Each structure stands twice: as C-alpha cells, then as structure tokens.
Amino acid sequence: MRILFAAAECAPMIKVGGMGDVVGSLPPALKKLGHDVRLIIPGYGKLWTLMDIAPEPIFRSNTMGVDFSVFETKHPSNGLPIYLVGHPCFDSERIYGGEDEDWRFTFFASAVSEFAWNSWKPQVLHCHDWHTGMIPVWMHQDPEISTVFTIHNLKYQGPWRWKLDQITWCPWYMHGDHTMASAMLYADRVNAVSPTYSREIRTSEYGEKLEGLLNYISGKLRGILNGVDLDEWNPATDNSLPAKFSVDNISGRAINKRVLQERMGLEVNPDKYLMGMVGRLVDQKGIDLLLQVANRLLSYTDSQVVVLGTGDRYLESSLWQLAIEYPGRFSVFLTYDDALSRLIYGGADAFLMPSRFEPCGISQLLAMRYGAIPIVRKVGGLVDTVEPYNPMNETGSGFCFDRYEPIDFYTSLVRSWEAYRHQKSWKELQLRAMSNKYSWDRSAKEYELMYKDVCGIKEPSPDAAEVEKFSYGQEADPSRKGKKIKL
C-alpha cells in the first residue's frame, strides 16, 4: 500500500513529545512489511541545515491564497522519503506556540491535501493530532484516499470552528467545534496510542469534553500501543553508557549507577536506592505528587532521587528547592540531555511515572528495557505495559497505584524501597522487566490491519499447516496435533 504520514514532528530531527517518536519509528516498521511509506512535515528552519535537501521543489501550488513549495529529502536514519512543505511561516526555529500557530498548521494541513491530490497520491493518509486535523475534513469526499487519524494527546485540540472560518475555507458539511473534533468525525478510522487510553477518553474523567463524540464514533475507534526502537534503545550497544549490559549480564548497571551518582552530585553508595525521573515537568506527569511526598520519603528512607527535564517554572523552582534542602540525596537537572537520560535509564534502580493521565508513555518502556523498575499510576498506556509486582508468586514488572493521591504514590515508593532490600528478588524483577519487548514491529502489524480494513483489503485465510506453524513457531509437527497451546 501507498501510505503518507502527515505530522508536525518526526524524530530525531524534530521532536517535542511522543508523537515525534511514533512518526520517526512506525514508518520504517511498516516498510519492512512491504509498504511504500513516505512522510510530509513542515519545512522548519533548522531542517535546511541538518538535512540534505534537493534544491529544486518537486511540487508547487497555492492554497489559502498563499504560494508554497514541497521539497524532497531522506530520513537520516532509515532513508524513507520525506517531503517538506516550504513557506516562510516555518522558517523560525519555533515548532509550537506563537500568535500564528493556528494559521500555520491549518495552512500545513491544506498544503498536504493539495500535495496528496495533485502529486504523490497515497491510498492511506495517516494524520497525527490536531495539527493535521483538517486533512480528513477536506479528504472526506475523495473516495480514492482513506484517512486515519491518531490521537496522541486529547488535551490539545486545535483552533475552534469560528477561528477556522476566519483563516480558511471550511466545507459546508463540516461539523465539530474544533480541529480535533472535526478530524475524529471525518477520518475513516481513528486510533489512540494505547488500548486503555482509547477506553478512558470515552469517559468524562479523561474525555476532555469530547467523550460524547468519542462514544458516537466508537465503531471506528481503536487503541494501538506504541512501541520502542529496539536497535536504538539497546543497553548492550548504547555508547552513551559508561558500561554496557544486557539481560544475560546486568553487572554493568552498578558502574552506571556510580557514574550517575557522581555526575548528579549524590552520595556515591551502591546500596542507596536510586530513583530517576525523565520528562516534561508539567502537571500531567505527576510532579505535584512527587513534591508532596518527597520530604516524607527522604525522611523515612535512605533513598536518592534524580530528576531530568524542563517545564513549568513553578515546578522547576520547587524541585530546585528540594535539591537545596537535601544535598547528596535529591538532584535536579533542568534541561534535556539525551546522554544523561540514557544514564538514568541504565543506572537508576527505579523510574518514576506518577502520571495524572498518560496516553501511552515511552519512558516506562525505555526504563524496563534498561532495567530500571517503573513506579507508575494505573492509567492509560501504563496499564497496558507495566504488570504490577506480586512478591508472593514473583510476577510483574513494576509497582502500580490507583488513585492520584499522595498517599497512594508514597505507599508504592515505600513498597519498592522495601523490595529493593531483597536483592535476589529485585534482580529477578529487573530481568523480567528487561525481557519485555514492545517493538514497533508488533505495532506495525496492527496498523497494517487497520489500513487494510479501511481500504477494504481482506486478509486471505491461511491453511491449517500455516496456522500450526505460526502457533508453534516452527514447521508443523504432526505429533503435536490436537494439543492445547498455552497462551
């Protein structure tokens, strides 16, 4: 199939949130399945120096009364074709924000539609979040192009209808209060980035006032879990780590822990329980819960905490104050540093994600991949990826709590601290967590089924021998015929 991804981000060149990871990693996984996958993103200013871009545009047109050009380049990691929408409104280093944000992305969506109609015509146009929300609206009456719309974060919904009427042409049939709502109405298929989140957003607690619409379109709504690039995020080959390690030999984690303690100004002690946190410092990520329990946690236990990220100024200031009050035990680094984030994943004993809501979450997957045990709230994709630890039967991959309350979070922290004191069981917990492999290959197969469904392509029924071969992972064995498979 011919598949065109339209998005505001694409890792590693342009990345602000999880959407960038998805758009950078899912297309090559789909390519391995035999599809012709290409991407189209805004031609941001810094891309012209980062990438080798053809000097002449491959397409020129006019939309919303504005001329634009489309240039072609290649993804630096996987070589997939990338189309850049060139216009002065994208020339600055800024990706989001600014008074013209609504106009910029509405213009981008319109330019993508013109390109898909008149240049490279896909069978499936896969749109991501509100920035591309007008594409399904404009494509609604084109029977040759099917649209898929992915909800990465329902909280961000785009410009309202009255503003859209002022900046562009809205079809007479368009309904919906804003870009996100309109996209969900007119896309042929809609998906959220985890099964649990796809159910949560149909409730008033997580629906962001769109739960009624989401229940209305539930027949075309599904949840597909994000994955991780297992080659890029591999502790056995990660050159950012002082000591590499694998699930077969995790002794290198002790060296990484020592280096992490030294770099973050903590007491260097291998026996101290070290918890890490990486991400945006905003309310969604549960920073307020950490602030409420930190004093009690550091008074009751001998734990250490490291935090890496930027965000809300008040939260940054509060975390900095804790670092001043607890030198050698609480450390905060108010920036984003990829190498340091990998050191936290590969050196911390546990990883904190007490999220208020979490559409999918990538950090908990990376933490488990690197042997840091996640401590998470049972919400969104965290439910789908972290199995609660059960010390009685030695199962699970992390510590989970239900309510968004300080006491619940604190209880999980103390439980994990106590579990860490039993090193044999803790190491087994680490090995179970590291054995989880949430790859993009598995996610790509689910997206492929959705694409085929929306295009009316039916899967052929395999013969019995193929089914048996798939079930057992080997050539069909007549001696096993009729035996039950343990799932």
Curated annotation (Swiss-Prot):
Catalytic activity: [(1->4)-alpha-D-glucosyl](n) + ADP-alpha-D-glucose = [(1->4)-alpha-D-glucosyl](n+1) + ADP + H(+)
CDD domains found in the cross-reference section: GT5_Glycogen_synthase_DULL1-like
Keywords: Glycogen biosynthesis, Glycosyltransferase, Transferase
EC number, as in UniProt: 2.4.1.21
Lineage: superkingdom: Bacteria
PANTHER family named among the record's database cross-references: ALPHA AMYLASE DOMAIN-CONTAINING PROTEIN (PTHR45825:SF11), GRANULE-BOUND STARCH SYNTHASE 1, CHLOROPLASTIC/AMYLOPLASTIC (PTHR45825)
Protein name, UniProt field: Glycogen synthase
Organism (species): Prochlorococcus marinus (strain NATL1A)
Lineage: Bacteria, Bacillati, Cyanobacteriota, Cyanophyceae, Synechococcales
